[in-house]
Protein backbone atom coordinates (compact mmCIF):
# COMPACT_ATOMS: atom_id res chain seq x y z
CA UNK A 1 0.00 0.00 0.00
CA UNK A 2 1.36 3.38 -1.02
CA UNK A 3 2.40 5.48 1.96
CA UNK A 4 0.50 8.74 2.35
CA UNK A 5 2.78 11.77 2.24
CA UNK A 6 3.28 13.49 5.58
CA UNK A 7 1.73 16.77 4.46
CA UNK A 8 -1.30 14.89 3.09
CA UNK A 9 -1.83 13.17 6.45
CA UNK A 10 -2.17 16.62 7.99
CA UNK A 11 -4.60 17.66 5.25
CA UNK A 12 -6.72 14.53 5.88
CA UNK A 13 -6.97 15.42 9.56
CA UNK A 14 -7.85 18.98 8.56
CA UNK A 15 -10.55 17.67 6.22
CA UNK A 16 -12.43 15.79 8.97
CA UNK A 17 -11.94 18.70 11.37
CA UNK A 18 -13.31 21.12 8.76
CA UNK A 19 -16.41 18.97 8.15
CA UNK A 20 -17.08 19.13 11.89
CA UNK A 21 -16.49 22.89 11.97
CA UNK A 22 -18.61 23.58 8.89
CA UNK A 23 -21.55 21.54 10.16
CA UNK A 24 -21.59 23.06 13.65
CA UNK A 25 -20.65 26.66 12.79
CA UNK A 26 -23.34 26.77 10.11
CA UNK A 27 -26.02 26.22 12.76
CA UNK A 28 -24.28 27.67 15.83
CA UNK A 29 -25.89 31.09 15.46
CA UNK A 30 -29.35 29.53 15.07
CA UNK A 31 -28.67 27.12 17.98
CA UNK A 32 -27.87 30.13 20.16
CA UNK A 33 -30.97 31.96 18.91
CA UNK A 34 -33.07 28.93 19.84
CA UNK A 35 -31.53 29.09 23.32
CA UNK A 36 -32.67 32.68 23.84
CA UNK A 37 -29.73 34.72 22.49
CA UNK A 38 -30.36 37.86 20.41
CA UNK A 39 -28.27 38.82 17.37
CA UNK A 40 -26.35 41.32 19.48
CA UNK A 41 -25.74 38.70 22.18
CA UNK A 42 -24.47 36.27 19.55
CA UNK A 43 -22.12 38.76 17.87
CA UNK A 44 -20.78 39.84 21.27
CA UNK A 45 -20.05 36.33 22.54
CA UNK A 46 -18.36 35.30 19.27
CA UNK A 47 -16.33 38.54 19.33
CA UNK A 48 -15.25 37.86 22.92
CA UNK A 49 -14.34 34.28 21.99
CA UNK A 50 -12.29 35.56 19.07
CA UNK A 51 -10.47 38.11 21.26
CA UNK A 52 -9.66 35.42 23.83
CA UNK A 53 -8.41 33.28 20.94
CA UNK A 54 -5.96 36.06 20.13
CA UNK A 55 -4.47 35.71 23.62
CA UNK A 56 -4.34 31.93 23.18
CA UNK A 57 -2.58 32.22 19.84
CA UNK A 58 -0.04 34.63 21.33
CA UNK A 59 0.63 32.09 24.09
CA UNK A 60 1.18 29.35 21.50
CA UNK A 61 3.56 31.52 19.52
CA UNK A 62 5.62 32.33 22.60
CA UNK A 63 5.66 29.03 24.50
CA UNK A 64 4.90 26.14 22.11
CA UNK A 65 7.86 24.83 20.09
CA UNK A 66 7.46 23.21 16.69
CA UNK A 67 8.55 19.88 18.17
CA UNK A 68 5.57 20.05 20.58
CA UNK A 69 3.02 21.40 18.12
CA UNK A 70 1.48 18.03 17.22
CA UNK A 71 0.88 17.29 20.90
CA UNK A 72 -0.64 20.73 21.40
CA UNK A 73 -3.02 20.30 18.45
CA UNK A 74 -4.06 16.87 19.76
CA UNK A 75 -4.85 18.33 23.20
CA UNK A 76 -6.83 21.19 21.63
CA UNK A 77 -8.89 18.71 19.61
CA UNK A 78 -9.69 16.66 22.71
CA UNK A 79 -10.73 19.75 24.70
CA UNK A 80 -12.95 20.86 21.81
CA UNK A 81 -14.48 17.37 21.66
CA UNK A 82 -15.34 17.33 25.38
CA UNK A 83 -16.64 20.91 25.25
CA UNK A 84 -18.99 20.14 22.34
CA UNK A 85 -20.41 17.21 24.30
CA UNK A 86 -21.10 19.64 27.15
CA UNK A 87 -22.78 22.12 24.76
CA UNK A 88 -24.92 19.23 23.52
CA UNK A 89 -26.03 18.67 27.12
CA UNK A 90 -26.76 22.39 27.72
CA UNK A 91 -29.33 22.66 24.92
CA UNK A 92 -32.62 24.21 26.15
CA UNK A 93 -31.56 24.03 29.81
CA UNK A 94 -31.59 27.81 30.20
CA UNK A 95 -28.11 28.15 31.67
CA UNK A 96 -26.93 31.17 29.68
CA UNK A 97 -23.69 31.66 31.62
CA UNK A 98 -22.47 28.11 31.00
CA UNK A 99 -23.43 28.40 27.33
CA UNK A 100 -21.44 31.64 27.08
CA UNK A 101 -18.35 30.00 28.58
CA UNK A 102 -18.70 26.89 26.41
CA UNK A 103 -19.11 28.89 23.19
CA UNK A 104 -15.99 30.89 24.05
CA UNK A 105 -14.05 27.63 24.56
CA UNK A 106 -15.48 26.33 21.27
CA UNK A 107 -14.33 29.42 19.37
CA UNK A 108 -10.94 29.36 21.12
CA UNK A 109 -10.12 25.70 20.40
CA UNK A 110 -11.30 26.00 16.81
CA UNK A 111 -8.96 28.90 16.15
CA UNK A 112 -6.03 27.28 17.96
CA UNK A 113 -6.26 24.17 15.78
CA UNK A 114 -6.79 26.15 12.58
CA UNK A 115 -3.79 28.41 13.17
CA UNK A 116 -1.48 25.48 13.93
CA UNK A 117 -2.05 23.52 10.71
CA UNK A 118 0.14 25.46 8.29
CA UNK A 119 3.15 25.69 10.66
CA UNK A 120 2.99 21.88 10.90
CA UNK A 121 2.96 21.60 7.12
CA UNK A 122 5.87 24.02 6.66
CA UNK A 123 8.15 21.71 8.65
CA UNK A 124 7.71 19.30 5.71
CA UNK A 125 7.13 21.49 2.67
CA UNK A 126 6.59 25.19 2.02
CA UNK A 127 5.45 26.89 -1.18
CA UNK A 128 2.53 28.96 -2.49
CA UNK A 129 0.78 25.89 -3.91
CA UNK A 130 0.70 23.94 -0.63
CA UNK A 131 -0.48 27.13 1.09
CA UNK A 132 -3.45 27.31 -1.28
CA UNK A 133 -4.09 23.56 -0.89
CA UNK A 134 -4.26 23.96 2.88
CA UNK A 135 -6.75 26.83 2.52
CA UNK A 136 -8.83 25.05 -0.12
CA UNK A 137 -8.97 21.87 1.99
CA UNK A 138 -10.41 23.87 4.87
CA UNK A 139 -12.91 25.69 2.66
CA UNK A 140 -14.00 22.62 0.68
CA UNK A 141 -14.59 20.34 3.64
CA UNK A 142 -16.33 23.05 5.64
CA UNK A 143 -18.75 23.10 2.73
CA UNK A 144 -19.06 19.32 2.97
CA UNK A 145 -20.10 19.88 6.59
CA UNK A 146 -22.70 22.38 5.44
CA UNK A 147 -23.88 19.80 2.88
CA UNK A 148 -24.36 17.17 5.58
CA UNK A 149 -26.39 19.63 7.63
CA UNK A 150 -28.43 20.76 4.63
CA UNK A 151 -29.34 17.19 3.71
CA UNK A 152 -30.37 16.24 7.24
CA UNK A 153 -31.83 19.32 8.97
CA UNK A 154 -35.58 19.06 9.50
CA UNK A 155 -35.74 15.45 8.32
CA UNK A 156 -36.60 12.34 10.28
CA UNK A 157 -33.79 9.75 10.32
CA UNK A 158 -34.48 6.37 11.99
CA UNK A 159 -37.31 8.03 13.85
CA UNK A 160 -35.21 10.98 15.09
CA UNK A 161 -36.01 14.52 13.94
CA UNK A 162 -32.73 16.15 12.92
CA UNK A 163 -32.54 19.54 14.65
CA UNK A 164 -29.60 21.81 15.50
CA UNK A 165 -28.58 19.63 18.45
CA UNK A 166 -28.54 16.47 16.32
CA UNK A 167 -26.33 18.30 13.81
CA UNK A 168 -24.05 19.17 16.72
CA UNK A 169 -23.84 15.48 17.62
CA UNK A 170 -22.89 14.58 14.03
CA UNK A 171 -20.26 17.32 14.16
CA UNK A 172 -18.82 15.67 17.27
CA UNK A 173 -18.55 12.36 15.38
CA UNK A 174 -16.47 13.96 12.60
CA UNK A 175 -14.33 15.68 15.22
CA UNK A 176 -13.69 12.30 16.86
CA UNK A 177 -12.49 10.93 13.50
CA UNK A 178 -10.08 13.85 13.10
CA UNK A 179 -8.68 13.07 16.56
CA UNK A 180 -8.12 9.43 15.57
CA UNK A 181 -6.33 10.54 12.38
CA UNK A 182 -4.18 12.89 14.45
CA UNK A 183 -3.18 10.14 16.87
CA UNK A 184 -2.19 7.84 13.99
CA UNK A 185 -0.27 10.52 12.14
CA UNK A 186 3.35 9.72 11.42
CA UNK A 187 4.03 13.27 10.33
CA UNK A 188 5.80 15.65 12.66
CA UNK A 189 7.00 12.98 15.09
CA UNK A 190 10.67 13.83 14.76
CA UNK A 191 10.69 17.54 14.15
CA UNK A 192 13.80 19.37 15.16
CA UNK A 193 13.20 22.61 16.93
CA UNK A 194 13.81 25.12 14.16
CA UNK A 195 12.19 27.98 16.01
CA UNK A 196 14.51 30.89 16.66
CA UNK A 197 15.49 31.42 20.26
CA UNK A 198 14.13 34.51 22.00
CA UNK A 199 12.46 35.62 18.80
CA UNK A 200 10.68 38.97 18.98
CA UNK A 201 8.33 38.61 16.05
CA UNK A 202 7.30 42.26 16.30
CA UNK A 203 10.92 43.40 15.88
CA UNK A 204 11.33 40.90 13.05
CA UNK A 205 8.25 42.25 11.24
CA UNK A 206 9.17 45.88 11.86
CA UNK A 207 12.40 45.33 9.92
CA UNK A 208 10.31 44.77 6.79
CA UNK A 209 8.07 47.54 5.48
CA UNK A 210 6.34 44.92 3.34
CA UNK A 211 5.36 42.83 6.37
CA UNK A 212 4.18 45.87 8.37
CA UNK A 213 1.84 46.89 5.54
CA UNK A 214 0.72 43.27 5.14
CA UNK A 215 -0.32 43.11 8.81
CA UNK A 216 -2.37 46.30 8.49
CA UNK A 217 -3.90 44.91 5.29
CA UNK A 218 -4.78 41.63 7.06
CA UNK A 219 -6.51 43.46 9.93
CA UNK A 220 -8.59 45.71 7.70
CA UNK A 221 -9.42 42.86 5.30
CA UNK A 222 -10.71 40.61 8.09
CA UNK A 223 -12.70 43.50 9.57
CA UNK A 224 -14.25 44.37 6.20
CA UNK A 225 -15.29 40.77 5.53
CA UNK A 226 -16.78 40.18 8.98
CA UNK A 227 -18.65 43.48 9.06
CA UNK A 228 -20.74 42.36 6.09
CA UNK A 229 -20.83 38.58 6.58
CA UNK A 230 -20.17 37.98 10.28
CA UNK A 231 -23.75 36.83 10.93
CA UNK A 232 -24.57 35.06 7.66
CA UNK A 233 -27.16 32.58 8.95
CA UNK A 234 -29.06 35.18 10.97
CA UNK A 235 -28.95 37.56 8.00
CA UNK A 236 -30.31 34.94 5.62
CA UNK A 237 -33.06 33.68 7.93
CA UNK A 238 -34.20 37.00 9.42
CA UNK A 239 -33.56 39.60 6.70
CA UNK A 240 -33.88 37.48 3.55
CA UNK A 241 -36.58 35.27 5.12
CA UNK A 242 -34.88 32.00 4.16
CA UNK A 243 -35.77 28.90 6.14
CA UNK A 244 -32.83 27.27 7.94
CA UNK A 245 -32.80 24.60 5.22
CA UNK A 246 -32.88 27.16 2.41
CA UNK A 247 -30.13 29.21 4.06
CA UNK A 248 -27.99 26.09 4.45
CA UNK A 249 -28.52 25.07 0.83
CA UNK A 250 -27.69 28.58 -0.34
CA UNK A 251 -24.43 28.67 1.63
CA UNK A 252 -23.63 25.16 0.44
CA UNK A 253 -24.16 25.88 -3.25
CA UNK A 254 -22.35 29.21 -3.15
CA UNK A 255 -19.58 27.77 -0.97
CA UNK A 256 -18.97 24.80 -3.27
CA UNK A 257 -19.01 27.11 -6.28
CA UNK A 258 -16.44 29.27 -4.48
CA UNK A 259 -14.24 26.21 -3.91
CA UNK A 260 -14.43 25.30 -7.59
CA UNK A 261 -13.65 28.88 -8.61
CA UNK A 262 -10.73 28.89 -6.15
CA UNK A 263 -9.29 25.71 -7.66
CA UNK A 264 -9.77 26.94 -11.23
CA UNK A 265 -8.30 30.32 -10.35
CA UNK A 266 -5.21 28.65 -8.86
CA UNK A 267 -4.65 26.48 -11.94
CA UNK A 268 -5.96 28.44 -14.90
CA UNK A 269 -7.48 31.83 -14.11
CA UNK A 270 -4.81 33.80 -12.28
CA UNK A 271 -3.94 36.93 -14.32
CA UNK A 272 -0.26 37.62 -14.91
CA UNK A 273 -0.83 41.13 -13.62
CA UNK A 274 -1.37 41.05 -9.83
CA UNK A 275 -3.12 44.42 -9.88
CA UNK A 276 -5.84 42.89 -12.07
CA UNK A 277 -6.11 39.96 -9.65
CA UNK A 278 -6.69 42.30 -6.70
CA UNK A 279 -9.25 44.28 -8.69
CA UNK A 280 -11.18 41.11 -9.51
CA UNK A 281 -11.16 39.90 -5.91
CA UNK A 282 -11.82 43.13 -4.03
CA UNK A 283 -12.74 45.85 -6.55
CA UNK A 284 -15.89 44.14 -7.81
CA UNK A 285 -16.87 43.35 -4.20
CA UNK A 286 -16.52 47.03 -3.31
CA UNK A 287 -18.71 48.15 -6.22
CA UNK A 288 -21.36 45.53 -5.35
CA UNK A 289 -21.41 46.62 -1.69
CA UNK A 290 -21.75 50.31 -2.60
CA UNK A 291 -24.66 49.56 -4.94
CA UNK A 292 -26.30 47.41 -2.25
CA UNK A 293 -25.97 50.24 0.28
CA UNK A 294 -27.25 52.98 -2.03
CA UNK A 295 -30.12 50.97 -3.51
CA UNK A 296 -31.25 49.37 -0.23
CA UNK A 297 -32.64 46.60 -2.44
CA UNK A 298 -32.85 43.10 -0.95
CA UNK A 299 -32.11 41.33 -4.27
CA UNK A 300 -29.09 43.50 -5.07
CA UNK A 301 -27.82 42.96 -1.53
CA UNK A 302 -28.16 39.19 -1.94
CA UNK A 303 -26.22 39.39 -5.22
CA UNK A 304 -23.47 41.40 -3.50
CA UNK A 305 -23.31 38.87 -0.67
CA UNK A 306 -23.19 35.99 -3.16
CA UNK A 307 -20.32 37.48 -5.15
CA UNK A 308 -18.37 38.15 -1.97
CA UNK A 309 -18.61 34.49 -0.94
CA UNK A 310 -17.92 33.22 -4.47
CA UNK A 311 -14.60 35.05 -4.74
CA UNK A 312 -13.56 34.56 -1.10
CA UNK A 313 -11.39 31.45 -1.63
CA UNK A 314 -9.74 32.63 -4.85
CA UNK A 315 -6.22 34.03 -5.25
CA UNK A 316 -4.98 33.21 -1.73
CA UNK A 317 -1.57 32.59 -3.31
CA UNK A 318 -1.48 36.20 -4.54
CA UNK A 319 -3.16 37.93 -1.58
CA UNK A 320 -1.39 36.03 1.22
CA UNK A 321 0.90 33.24 0.04
CA UNK A 322 3.86 35.39 -0.98
CA UNK A 323 4.02 37.25 2.34
CA UNK A 324 3.71 34.08 4.43
CA UNK A 325 6.31 32.11 2.49
CA UNK A 326 8.80 34.99 2.52
CA UNK A 327 9.38 34.25 6.23
CA UNK A 328 12.30 32.04 7.25
CA UNK A 329 11.25 28.60 8.55
CA UNK A 330 12.66 29.20 12.03
CA UNK A 331 10.24 32.12 12.45
CA UNK A 332 7.31 30.43 10.71
CA UNK A 333 5.28 29.33 13.76
CA UNK A 334 5.71 32.64 15.56
CA UNK A 335 4.93 34.64 12.43
CA UNK A 336 1.89 32.54 11.51
CA UNK A 337 0.47 32.91 14.99
CA UNK A 338 1.07 36.66 14.99
CA UNK A 339 -0.59 36.95 11.58
CA UNK A 340 -3.64 35.11 12.90
CA UNK A 341 -3.66 37.36 15.97
CA UNK A 342 -3.92 40.40 13.69
CA UNK A 343 -6.50 38.74 11.48
CA UNK A 344 -8.68 37.59 14.37
CA UNK A 345 -8.53 41.01 16.00
CA UNK A 346 -9.92 42.36 12.74
CA UNK A 347 -12.50 39.59 12.59
CA UNK A 348 -13.62 40.18 16.19
CA UNK A 349 -13.97 43.90 15.50
CA UNK A 350 -15.91 43.17 12.32
CA UNK A 351 -18.30 40.71 14.00
CA UNK A 352 -18.98 43.24 16.75
CA UNK A 353 -19.68 45.97 14.18
CA UNK A 354 -21.81 43.51 12.20
CA UNK A 355 -23.99 42.97 15.29
CA UNK A 356 -24.38 46.73 15.76
CA UNK A 357 -25.20 47.34 12.07
CA UNK A 358 -27.52 44.31 12.04
CA UNK A 359 -29.80 46.05 14.55
CA UNK A 360 -29.76 49.31 12.53
CA UNK A 361 -30.41 47.81 9.11
CA UNK A 362 -29.06 45.39 6.51
CA UNK A 363 -27.73 48.07 4.14
CA UNK A 364 -25.45 49.50 6.83
CA UNK A 365 -23.59 46.21 7.24
CA UNK A 366 -22.54 46.38 3.59
CA UNK A 367 -22.06 50.16 3.55
CA UNK A 368 -19.59 50.07 6.45
CA UNK A 369 -17.81 47.08 4.91
CA UNK A 370 -17.44 49.01 1.63
CA UNK A 371 -15.81 51.86 3.56
CA UNK A 372 -13.21 49.46 4.98
CA UNK A 373 -12.68 47.93 1.53
CA UNK A 374 -11.38 51.27 0.23
CA UNK A 375 -8.40 50.98 2.58
CA UNK A 376 -7.96 47.24 1.96
CA UNK A 377 -7.75 47.69 -1.81
CA UNK A 378 -5.34 50.62 -1.48
CA UNK A 379 -3.05 48.60 0.79
CA UNK A 380 -3.25 45.55 -1.51
CA UNK A 381 -2.09 47.65 -4.48
CA UNK A 382 0.70 49.16 -2.38
CA UNK A 383 1.87 45.69 -1.29
CA UNK A 384 2.19 44.63 -4.92
CA UNK A 385 4.19 47.78 -5.64
CA UNK A 386 6.55 47.09 -2.70
CA UNK A 387 6.92 43.45 -3.70
CA UNK A 388 7.86 44.30 -7.27
CA UNK A 389 10.22 46.99 -6.02
CA UNK A 390 12.02 44.49 -3.75
CA UNK A 391 12.28 42.00 -6.61
CA UNK A 392 13.73 44.70 -8.89
CA UNK A 393 16.35 45.71 -6.30
CA UNK A 394 17.40 42.08 -5.80
Describe these PLM feature segments.
Residues 78-94, 283-296:
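C-terminal ends and interior cores of transmembrane alpha-helices
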Amino acid sequence: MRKIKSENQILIMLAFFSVSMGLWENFRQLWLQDNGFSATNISNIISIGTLISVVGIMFVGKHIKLSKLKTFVSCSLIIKFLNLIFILYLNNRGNMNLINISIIIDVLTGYLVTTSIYPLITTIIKNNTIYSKRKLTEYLFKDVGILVGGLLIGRSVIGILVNYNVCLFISIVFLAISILVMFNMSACKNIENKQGENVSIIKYILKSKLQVIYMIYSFIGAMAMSTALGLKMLTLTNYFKFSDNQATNYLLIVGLAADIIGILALKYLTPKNDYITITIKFGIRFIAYVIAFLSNNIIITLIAMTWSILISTSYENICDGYYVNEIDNKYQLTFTNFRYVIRYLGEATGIFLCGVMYEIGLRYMFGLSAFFLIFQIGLAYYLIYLRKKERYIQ
